[in-house]
Amino acid sequence: MRNTSKEVQSTSYRYAPCDWYYHLPVKRSEKPVGAPPASQIPGLSDLRDSPNVNLPRARRYWIKETDSEYVKLAKQGGRPDLLKHFAPGTRQGSPVAYSLPDWYIHHSKPPTSHQREVPVVSIPDYMVYEEFNPDQANGSYESRQGPFDFDRKTIWQREAEELENVKRKVKLPAINSKNPSKTGTPVSHKEPERSRLSLPPMPGQKNSSPTNFSKLISNGYKDEWLQQQKAEADRRTPKTSRASVSSKSTEDSKSNQDTETPENPETPEGSEKTPDAEVSSPSESTPAELK
């Protein structure tokens, strides 16, 4: 930038200075100016060289017992050559470029097979396959279980095994299902004690035919059950009671007919009512609102 001090003085009446864009260099003063220290931490700046300060008296109370190790080190001047890097064996010789580690530079030579270390690979026990060797077992071999163990026993089988271990045997009633298509037995209200002991058959011991889903959707099993219930009801009712009920019903019907038609010899034969008239008579007796 050229010096325009003369132009500014001659043309100050025409152009206003742009102070926000540039500033004129101020003339340096030749008076000595006290520069601030490079660091505000005592002991790291040029205070040790200042002749106006009494060093023993000023530094007497610098380091205190309550100061941390970092503050004590900073007050004593810090670690020497903290920000300098010295390559090994080159401190007394000519300066050498910064030595980078081998893992950082791709130009470095890869280690040979003799220098390589075999990495130690650790695999979980359940992922390692080992062939069974009976010679190494010696009676103390335990089969390894997988990470997930499934219990396939039902609660009834487990309870039965526990009772056998305690030598307490409970005799359960036999499960005789009348309907082979159903897995459970119907609970009857007449025998509550027996129904408590009845248990459904085991899923593995099912000998009946598999469920026919087309028959299940079309309510075929329901119709079979209704037919079986009806047949059982017919078997329970005795045949003698049916005959007595039928004879009583016939006698009652005959007595009702005799009471309704009394004997009258004087009535002519033509006065007998025809069946058509008997059929039409109830329609005449019905009120007009119901017609």
UniProtKB/Swiss-Prot annotation:
Residues 221-237 have a biased composition (Basic and acidic residues). The keyword Phosphoprotein applies. The modification Phosphoserine is found at S50. InterPro entries: DUF5524. Residues 29-50, 168-291 are annotated as: Disordered. Keywords: Phosphoprotein. Pfam families: DUF5524 (PF17662). Transmembrane segments: none annotated. Residues 176-186, 205-217, 280-291 have a biased composition (Polar residues). This is Uncharacterized protein C7orf57 homolog. It comes from Mus musculus (Mouse). The lineage of its organism: Eukaryota, Metazoa, Chordata, Craniata, Vertebrata. The gene is Gm11992.
